[in-house]
């Protein structure tokens, strides 16, 4: 399943990010991918050795950690260090699959259950640049407003189509979820959404408390901590 997460960054935050990224040092995006991905990857990424990168990636982590919908959908256990990429002048990233595990500065290694793209460019400012994801439900093409994020299973084949006008800038990361199984995670997300909807409509009652108890018991049964 794919989950759009709106408003991870405010318009003011996006504008500030874009202004700072104009001053960033950009390097060949192939430096952070494996042999298979390098064959189809043609973009640029912010140099992770720069002081600016360290500040911006911390801000992205803070933003997603404070976003309730992101937490409900991902149930994150470990977040990778966010990276930043840029596409322009027909740059693209062909179909590829993300690595199953990644190194992590604190945890050593993490499993990649979910991938996330945080859009930092207004969709009207560039042509092309859609994130295309193939999963069991078909093919999805995603081009969200700046400040919005999309979550999708890391096991999915995906690509970024060529940017034929303008510049597409985004941040991206991987998540190891407390719930390894996509279907179980999707069920918990749907249950959580329905509980929140019922609470807003009817307030607290015994039936909602029973559903909340069910949610937490399922989370307790399925989670890997």
From Swiss-Prot:
InterPro entries, per database record: Oxoglu/Fe-dep_dioxygenase_dom (IPR005123), PKHD_C (IPR041097), PKHD_hydroxylase (IPR023550), Pro_4_hyd_alph (IPR006620), Pro_4_hyd_alph_FE2OG_OXY (IPR044862)
Signal peptide boundaries: none
Pfam families: 2OG-FeII_Oxy_3 (PF13640), PKHD_C (PF18331)
Cofactor binding note of this UniProt entry: Binds 1 Fe(2+) ion per subunit.
Keyword check for Iron: yes
UniProt KW Nucleus keyword: no
Superkingdom of the organism of origin: Bacteria
MF (Gene Ontology): 2-oxoglutarate-dependent dioxygenase activity; iron ion binding; L-ascorbic acid binding
Keywords for the protein's UniProt record, in alphabetical order: Dioxygenase, Iron, Metal-binding, Oxidoreductase, Vitamin C
Cofactor(s) listed: Fe(2+); L-ascorbate
Domain Fe2OG dioxygenase stretches: 78-177
Binding site for Fe cation: 96, 98, 158
E.C. number: 1.14.11.-
Annotated residues for binding of 2-oxoglutarate: 168
Family annotation (Gene3D superfamilies): q2cbj1_9rhob like domain, Rabenosyn, Rab binding domain
Gene Ontology BP, a term: intracellular iron ion homeostasis
SMART domains reported for this sequence: P4Hc
Enzyme class: oxidoreductase
Full protein name: PKHD-type hydroxylase YbiX
